[in-house]
Amino acid sequence: MSTAAASARSALADADSALLRAEGVSKRFGGLQALAEVGLRIATGQIYGLIGPNGAGKTTFFNVITGLYTPDSGTFVLDGRPYEPTAVHEVAAAGIARTFQNIRLFGEMTALENVMVGRHVRTRCGAWAAMLRPPAQRREEAEIRARATQLLEYVGIARYADFPSRTLSYGDQRRLEIARALATDPKLLALDEPAAGMNATEKVSLRGLLEHIRDDGRTILLIEHDVKLVMGLCDRVTVLDYGKVIAEGLPADVQRDKAVIEAYLGAGHD
């Protein structure tokens, strides 16, 4: 990704075209202040990185914006509207989909069926229709299957459509999780360490997929420990340490930040 391209997308955020704005987000667990007045602004069409040492609060922030944790304080605006993360299914309906650090697929279901499950958040027919199977429900089910097939092709694993998801390679399971998240038609795709456990070749392939998703107009929030991947892929980066924001900006600027080097990158980073 060129510096000019990253700067252009960052300028969008400065022009208040933010898809997601979070301000003053705090979360405490007993005596542990997991998040302290965290704020960030993600522009539409960006890949936005959230990095920091282990225990910095990254996954806690993900869990807050996706309804798994209730924040003690803070406000959110999603796509120009006030947003309150509540139940997980309501978060998906609002337009945020996520993956987890640990893969969470239905192992005995096929790859296609896993993606179809994700698509059901956008269905119009209710439970009675699912049982009675009127023509409208059957048409919708066919549409769901077709869309799921398209998404498997999109992420590059269509040949495994009928395979149980547990039989896929680790990297392909990660791609399947992304396809399932995309099936909800999210405004914001939140990925929690998607490159964890991948080899170098798989990481290069993942980077290409995420760039493709962004270039198709999706917005991505990314937690990732692979600093090289983050700095080469993201348009902007926020760094957390002990639940606080210690730096935010273009990747090149963040890499030179003294507080970031001391807390996370290490003195030997270049």
Regions found by a protein language model. Name each.
Residues S2-D270:
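Glycine-rich phosphate-binding loops of nucleotide-dependent enzymes
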